[in-house]
Amino acid sequence: MSSGALFPSLVPGSRGSSSKYLVEFRAGKMSLKGSTVTPDKRKGLVYIQQTDDSLIHFCWKDRTSGSVDDDLIIFPDDCEFKRVSQCTTGRVYVLKFKAGSKRLFFWMQEPKTDKDEEHCRKVNEYLNNPPMPGALGGSGSGSHELSALGGEGGLQSLLGNMSHNQLMQLIGPTGLGGLGGLGALTGPGLASLLGSGGPTTSSSSSSSRSQSAAVTPSSTTSSTRTTSAPVAPAAAPATTPSPAVSSNDGASAATSPTQAIQLSDLQNILATMNVPATGEGGQQVDLASVLTPEIMAPILANAEVQERLMPYLPSGESLPQTADEIQNTLTSPQFQQALSMFSAALASGQLGPLMSQFGLPADAVDAANKGDIEAFAKAMQSTSSQKERESSEKKEEEEDMSLD
């Protein structure tokens, strides 16, 4: 399963986006029932757009009513768009997700077939190789612009409401411009911005504040959003595909009312900064090379460990929360890449202030400040052991009281 995966947009169109779609073509939806798919006769439009937060959206809307039935956020390598060769009665395409059995079927409504292959190629290109977001102009202004996000209060609100997916996006190569942002904050720096006694104010900011920050509801979900507005079906063109088609070929966080902060603001500011120097923690450790499938296998075989990890699995109709999914998630290329990204960011010695925002113990924050991954891991393990002891002691006390 992909750790970056896909999830529906909370409110389609609520975030700023380019006025022009990356690719669009007329196509109808198809519903999957058992092993066959049947066409939805409404006139539709498939389009891909990149919103101001740099995320790629795969959308389908009814051309008659204008309502958007599907608005899915797609990450690279999540899915593949291809033609269903088994269907000979129409031009049927499937958006097949590489993790799970989720599939979305569409039938072409373009009058000519000459651009079908081009549309298919462009869909795959933009989904798996999205354009790089435009960086903010002006060097050396990162600290000032970060201050404009609202200082400690605003950043804490933003970071506290981030999902796992968004945090990985923030510290990833796109969000951080090659892990350059955190280490390049000098002067007041990230430490003073996150650890100051009060919020920093600014009269202006390079990023728009007209929109409220929207946080996706889960890290990975394959469900689509269905609008409640009634839709008037339109007559199907003569090329409507046959009902029987084999399906075997594929499948807002609230911020301060006076200072709405967007994840894209922080991302764009960090993306303009320079790559940090190596932290003080000595030789850099890549967690991806440590937490290998071979090492994790006996740990994941423990039923107690599985039970503790299960609630953190992505949820969705085609994403069962099972022990197998835990294994699939931790061994996926996306998860391994996220580990490497986090290792590099932690080794930079600049994640201490960020870690303190998540309520981590002082030892862990100190290790993060030094870029000492080994000390950070030991601090986290010590904290976990202490919590387990406290929980066990509390349970024993409750049992003793019940006996009395």
Swiss-Prot record:
The lineage of its organism: Eukaryota, Metazoa, Chordata, Craniata, Vertebrata. The keyword Nucleus applies. GO terms for biological process: proteasome assembly. CDD domains: PH_Rpn13. Residues 248-258 have a biased composition (Polar residues). Component of the 26S proteasome, a multiprotein complex involved in the ATP-dependent degradation of ubiquitinated proteins. This complex plays a key role in the maintenance of protein homeostasis by removing misfolded or damaged proteins, which could impair cellular functions, and by removing proteins whose functions are no longer required. Therefore, the proteasome participates in numerous cellular processes, including cell cycle progression, apoptosis, or DNA damage repair. Within the complex, functions as a proteasomal ubiquitin receptor. Component of the 19S proteasome regulatory particle complex. The 26S proteasome consists of a 20S core particle (CP) and two 19S regulatory subunits (RP). The keyword Cytoplasm applies. It comes from the Eukaryota. Residues 195-247 have a biased composition (Low complexity). Keywords: Cytoplasm, Nucleus, Proteasome. Its main location: cytoplasm. Residues 17-130 form the Pru domain. Residues 386-395 have a biased composition (Basic and acidic residues). This is Proteasomal ubiquitin receptor ADRM1-B. It is found in: Cytoplasm; Nucleus.
